[in-house]
């Protein structure tokens, strides 16, 4: 596979920045990394080469731009997924929700949030129905919300095809 070929060329997998060596070239994963991780790699003297997916990079830039505008970032996705963690690592205080129930609970506990400027972004692999239920709820509740559907179309197509295939198999 790809990793075997990379290892044959002298590439090694590291789990944390403290495993990087000065002068070593480190390629980031497609899911992206937090600002803290990239800073730690550079502090160790590693040369960082970004392999982040352009769709993920776009979400990170949207989040940063929104924060500069004074908006709170709302990420819909799997909170422990590397992509979500990487994007969140570029934000000052993002809200991460996995489903509409979590969104509803948060708004019940923080009713003033509905009037604050915010932006809603999705993990690229977020399940469309989950995203849409969160959008529907927040649209009704929030008075200053920007919504950016950042689900990757190619991923969405594969998810739909997989669901169709499994339905046929049942």
Show which residues each predicted segment covers.
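The feature marks the mature, well-folded catalytic cores of soluble enzymes
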Residues: 1-170
